[in-house]
Every structure is written in structure tokens, then in C-alpha cells.
Amino acid sequence: MKTASGGLARRKGTSMARLKNGKHRRKDGSWDPLKDSSTDRQTAQVIPRTPQSASSSYTLAYVDDEFLCREELRPVRLQLELLKTEMILTERNIKSTVVMFGGARIPAPGQEAWAAKNDIQKKNLENASIYYDQARRFAQLCSNQSKSSDYHEYVVVTGGGPGVMEAGNRGAADVGAPSIGLNIVLPHEQAPNPYVTPELSFNFHYFAIRKMHFLMRAKAITIFPGGFGTLDEFFEAVTLIQTKRMAPIPLILFSKAFWHDIINFEALANFGTIAPEDLQLLHFAETAEEAWQIIADFYDLNAEAAP
């Protein structure tokens, strides 16, 4: 029925922005008259079982695991992995992060080097426990800064696993701050470390999408001693910054001695495969305080804290 002004009249007792049960159709409260997919998913579970309805072809596409895992659906799965984490972080109003990369095999002080295959590795890994302590302390410093923004800025993010990753999440938990864990399915059994905030604990199939999420909100990246995974993450970040596919942000390597043993950066510049000025993309730190000061200076956080 139209009103005198030509508009459609609302039926008495109804709200255009709410369903009959009083709940908004969408989280933002906007009206959506289309039936939602979760309702149909529930309805489809109780339909009469017949040869036709029992066929896999009859299963709703978006709840058909076998269909979603088909090779042809890889682009869809890539999009889903990107969207799920992005939507949750947006809903939590996570605006920026501090990324912590580092070895899963580095034990906490006093713990045995579980990954060591011989006495030399055992000694080296247990000596490397100093980086666990520094990572934990660094995460505390980041999280103290994050508190001033109600934990929307400078939120610690790690790979969610053991070693340096655990130390990062643990440091945030020490000061009552949330932290993010971006875990990935690996051939051996792995669970997220117990210090990741449960609502910010994510799991990935695709390394590429996982690395995108590490960098999409990053205000700084720290790289502690680690193995192939840490090197992969480091080179991804430094390449994006060097090629200007990513804004310059502090890229901080912990332990100059370790990294110079592993990679001869100066040799790359001398050989001409990188420019001498590319070396300026790298910062080195020995302690959590040194690393945090690099970030504070870059973003002028000391001035913000001044009375």
C-alpha cells in the first residue's frame, strides 16, 4: 500500500531493519531480505533421505567439503583463506601489528633442545635460548605500547608455533595483551602455542596467504635467528621493501653475529647483485630495548609519550 506521498507504508508492528525474531539480518544492521545461507544449511540436514538427496551432487556447494577441496577450487580456497583472517582482524579493529619471525627450534631457557640431532646442535640451540628471552621481552615492550591504543595498534603477531614464536605470544600475555598467531598445517603434528589469544589464532593451508597476512598490517618486522622458514619470511619482506611493493618499515635482525655468519650481505653489494644502499634497509639489534628504540624513533613514539 502506498502513502499519500507515494512511498510504501510499513506494515504495523514490523521493522524494515529487523527480522521477525528481532535480530538484524546483517551485523551492521542493514536490511537484507534474502534468506541467509546458514538457515538453508540447517534445513538441508533434516530433509527426507532419498536416493536423490543422498547423492553428493545434491549437497549444497558451500558445505560440500569434497567439492571445495577439488583442484579447480584452488582460487576459491585462496580467497577464503585471505578473507577469513582479514574479516576477523577487521572485526577486532586490529589496525597495525609488529611481526616477530624466528626459529621454532629455539628452546626457552632451562628447557632441552628437543630438535637437536647431535651434541653440537644441542649446545647451539640451548645457547640460543637468549633469543627466546629477548623475543619475550620485546613482545612485552610492543604490547605496552599497544595498550595506549586499547590494543588496536602495534599488536604482536607470530607464526603461532613454538620457539621464538611462543616467546612472542608469551611476552604479550605477560602484560595482559592480546596477540595473534598465524599457524600453518605441516606434515608433523603441530598445535598453536598456549599463549596465542584464542580468538586471534588462525590456521593456514597456503604459505603465500599466510605471508600476506603477516605483512598487510605490519608497522615493523623483527627477524630472530631461525631456519628455512625464517629465511623465507625475511627475504619475502626485504624484497617487497627493496622493490617498493611495500612501504619502508623497520626491518630488524636480532644478533648481527648470527646473520653475518648466515648471509654475507656486503658480498652481495660488492658483487653488484644488490645496490649498496639496499644495505640501509636492514637494522640490527642485540636486545629487545634496542629493537624497540628503532621502532620508536621511526614512528616518533617518544614524542607521542612526552607530556
Model region roles, listed by residue range:
Residues 253-307:
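C-terminal functional extensions of proteins
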Residues 152-155, 248-250, 279-282:
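Residue-level recognition of the N-termini of beta-strands and the immediately preceding loop/turn
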Residues 28-36, 40-182:
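Glycine-rich beta-alpha loop segments
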Residues 176-189, 224, 238-262, 277:
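Short, acidic/small-residue loops that bind anionic groups at enzyme active sites
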Residues 157-224, 228-229, 235:
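Phosphate/pyrophosphate-binding betaalpha-module
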Residues 90-93, 148-150, 173, 193-195, ...:
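Solvent-exposed alpha-helices and their adjacent loops that cap or buttress functional pockets
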Residues 115-116, 173-174, 236-241, 267-271, ...:
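Short, solvent-exposed amphipathic alpha-helical segments in soluble enzyme
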Residues 1-23:
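N-terminal amphipathic/basic-hydrophobic helices that include classical n-h-c signal peptides
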